[in-house]
Swiss-Prot record:
Matching InterPro entries: ATP_synth_F1_dsu/esu, ATP_synth_F1_dsu/esu_N, ATPsynth_dsu/esu_N
Species per Swiss-Prot/TrEMBL record: Nitratiruptor sp. (strain SB155-2)
GO-annotated cellular components: plasma membrane; proton-transporting ATP synthase complex
Subcellular location: Cell inner membrane
Gene: atpC
Keywords, ordered alphabetically: ATP synthesis, Cell inner membrane, Cell membrane, CF(1), Hydrogen ion transport, Ion transport, Membrane, Transport
PANTHER family to which the protein is assigned, alphabetical: ATP SYNTHASE DELTA/EPSILON CHAIN, ATP SYNTHASE EPSILON CHAIN, CHLOROPLASTIC
Listed Pfam families: ATP-synt_DE_N (PF02823)
Membrane topology: Peripheral membrane protein
Protein name: ATP synthase epsilon chain
């Protein structure tokens, strides 16, 4: 199975690194998916959720405030200002991550409609975790 190498980096350090089956980014012009052997591109990222599908079929979600992504044939590197992985082993840990993610998004945008949309996506992504 073909995979894509994905890195998500913030000023504080590496948030995610690994092989993935696919990844969906919140691009400035709309969401877009990346699969192995994708055409090269550079895109701005807006506040939203990066959705990752791992080779074993499991899914991970990382909320970001803004940044950019550089995609080449078999690698995608996202440099973002802030990120919160939606993960946890207990409901309280996941609830804490959801609150952190909402605060991150609220600090990145004043557009109330966009905030509501992203917050709904955060809640949906957290249910998958």
């Amino acid at each position: 199975m073909d995979t894509l190498k994905l890195e998500i980096v913030t000023p504080e350090g590496l948030i995610f690194q690994g092989d993935v089956k696919s990844v969906t980014f919140p691009g400035e012009e709309g969401e877009f998916g990346v699969l192995p052997k994708h055409a090269s591109l550079l895109s701005l990222l807006k506040p939203g959720v990066i959705e990752i599908e791992l080779p074993d079929g499991k899914k991970e979600s990382i909320v970001i405030n803004w940044g950019h992504v550089n995609v080449s044939e078999n690698q995608a590197t996202a440099l973002v200002e802030g990120a919160v992985p939606l993960e946890g082993t207990t409901e309280s840990e996941i609830a804490k991550k959801i609150e952190e993610a909402k605060k991150l998004i609220e600090s990145a945008s004043e557009n109330k409609a966009a905030l509501a949309t992203v917050e709904a996506r955060i809640e949906k992504a957290a249910k998958i975790v």
